[in-house]
Amino acid sequence: MKKKFKSAVLFSLLCFLTNAQDLIKSGPMVGYSTMREVLLWVQTNREAEVYFEYYEKNNPKIRFKTERLKTVKKNGFVGKLIADQVMPGKEYNYDVFINGKKIKRDYAMEFQSQKLWKWRTDPPNINFAIGSCNYVNEKEFDRPGKPYGSNFEIFNSIHDKNPDFMLWLGDNTYLRESDWNSRTGFVHRYTHTRSLPELQPLLASTHHYAIWDDHDFGPNNSDSSYWLKETASEIFQLFWGNPNYDVTGNGGITGFFQWGDLDFFLLDNRYHRTSNKNFTGTRQILGSDQIDWLINALSFSDAPFKFIVVGGQVLSTESLYENHAVFSEERRYLLDKIREAKIEGVIFLDGDRHHTVLSKMQESKYVYPIYDLTCSSLTAGAYKNDETFNAYKLEETLVGENNFGVLSVVGSKNDRELIVKIFNKDGEELWRKSIKSNDLKY
């Protein structure tokens, strides 16, 4: 009788623990990092209490806990919690607890706080990954025929590069016709994409930042007239972990973050956008308020490299599709303002085009070259494109297959170097370029 009782207890305990493991829908994911706090994210598949426990890698006996949070259906069972007992320049392991039980994973769950380096040492070496256009197939809602998404092992290849963080350049998910007319559809699509098995190790140990483009905002080529743009903004913020959004106070996801001595300006190319087909008045992608904020923020920045992150190509002279060249007056206004303000170290990062290319614009010998790195696509269909009408393209950098980038910044404070490397889905290097910060000055 006692043996039966013990067996029943063990069986019940095993079921309870298994049930806790099964409650994870996606994640955990590591969001933004600062010197004193880090965002941690997880999604359960039903209502549950979640919290995180974390500790320094070299001092595992002293453990810290986040607050506890109850995930609810209204918020897609998403939990976002802050690790607020971190100290600068430390590496941490963490565990996630669901209904009081620790969830085990067979891959690393770790994060880092940023270093306190200024006035003390040279800035740290920095490595970050970039990519755009991530299409995860769901046959029930996809177009008939050949699946549009493929090569999901690319996320294992990114993970193997061990970047400090990943910067998602838009179209990070693809809303379908069944999604973009309801909040329920948004939550489903973001959940489905975030739950991709190949993505989980990368989410768990690399910090993540993101902007959007049309496909994670609404319908194809969607603009400011989109009827659910506030819902789009809400769900984007729910599923991502940027440190701030809507810094202009006019709606949307415009934001900013720093990593080491680098500054990143996260632009919103959808919320205030004029329809591509509307030529009756002032045409804009970003809008004057966002551009004026950007110029002011760039002027304040003393970063050797100032990365302007936006969903679509800026420098390309091809007046095609959704390039900024199609909105020529605003493009001219933006670039003129950057030159007029004597802002140094500008590099655009963008996606959208389903191919990768580096563009370089230098109007005369009296100004430094501005670069625009287009990196696309991760898993959505990739195509060869010669960018025939892009006067600024560097021919040898065109890539027409699924790919990602790793950008490394090294060197002393007054002599920083950016090394751009593009890899295929298997992590094999396709090309690299070096850009010196001292070459991006007047």
Where are these regions (language model features)?
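Metal-dependent phosphoester/phosphodiester hydrolase catalytic core
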Residues: 21-442
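Bacterial Sec-dependent N-terminal signal peptides
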Residues: 1-23
